[in-house]
């Protein structure tokens, strides 16, 4: 089922000699088939011909686009790509009960009159595991003489599992692929090179690979050619990018004696002919957070593009693609004392909007840098708070962050006029109910605009993953992990407990104790709830939140409409919502708006607050 050694040598020799070589990159969907066909209650959805399916994020991939640029620089290659995250979002007809027909049809459509010599499957997330195995099998069925390889963050960490589970796979790349691909395709006899390579694993070398594998990085990133976005269907990535889940607000400037109001626009309105384009200005991250696996692919030592190279690439995005917004995906953008200022300055000079998807190290976010971001039209930041428990941060996550820094940065952002999305992780190995209660209590005192609460996901390649193996904590296979589905247990918490607390904290922090509601910024709060309803139109807590805001503005008729809608949805799915309502002590059996509002204000009053100071000290631009 795999290629013979002579055929591998033949494919590589043709490329080495400068003959035209066809390369096809395939990206599996970052969603399991079961979650796509039957999305759980708390998943966002897409609709195809009146049937709901699990929502699939369409983020432009940087791995295969960088590899394409590098291959085109050194070899005579024709590169094509099929991203099945885009394919699923562009479906016109509802799919059958498998991905197979979708995969086959999309590949055949992309390869009409063209046959790939090399097929590369790239996977980043655990949820892509089963889909990537399907693509390897289908690729061999369609193109039995192609050299089939696989790589990416997930495959680097799970290379043994891929070789065990896929007899169709010829070789696996370990870590970043630019230099390994160059060395392979330049080798005199490919099979001899592979037998001794520290960057590639085959079925024949797997037994001795563990002891000799090592990264083979391009150390001077300026040597890399520009990322080749041309192999992608760029407009297709406008369908459902991660950035559309964030509010991307603009902040109104007002008198210091007036309350600050924000106008939050759904970022989809910002998506023009192409979506915001991702960039990386560096690779690597020196920190050792136990839940992170990026070092498995990119290492811990920092490598940077020069600021001048970043400027050149940004200008190219503007000139060639009409780019107006970028998504910065560096794992550690804040590396270097002045470099972050210079890179942001380059984007500001070109009037490019920027969104920091992977968040920014909070210790480095002083007021000077935050003001620079605000003056550069950055109106929203993702903050990697991760937990409100000092023990969890220090001992379980090994994250260099103190709760005092969290409070200071969130307060500074609000005063400067930057909307904040706080990332929170629940269910780390060793985390207890007491830790979660401590986190809940602290986070209520932090006036972030929105909290994004995720199930702790043991990414293959992370220390957390290895710890879960050592503790025999896995209840489901690692590849079943999802930011809304727990696959491990802790000594104190079952997977169901972890999922319950994750969603409970979402409901509590974003709706019942919504920061903007408590600060009296009702229009801001309503826009946030409306964004939720645009993703899930039957979310009762979003209707409840709008009702709270309207009642607080004495718009009682409108408030009652939304309260009634919330109660209706609660009762329609009572078995699902009842545990959360009980924990939050919300009585819907005999719901009375006036009594509810009085009770809620009493709950708010119990939380330590600096709301007046926060409001009154907003900076005026």
Question: Where would I find each of the regions flagged by the language model?
Answer:
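C-terminal accessory regions of radical SAM enzymes
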Residues: 2, 6, 20-35, 44-55, ...
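Acidic, low-complexity intrinsically disordered segments
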Residues: 2-311, 318-322
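Conserved beta-strand positions
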Residues: 25, 121, 150, 174, ...
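Radical SAM [4Fe-4S] cluster-binding motif and immediate context
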Residues: 59, 229-421, 426-428, 432-441
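Short acidic, glycine/proline-enriched helix-loop-strand junctions
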Residues: 146, 352-353, 397, 401-405, ...
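Structural recognition of alpha->loop->beta junctions
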Residues: 162-180, 370-381, 438-453
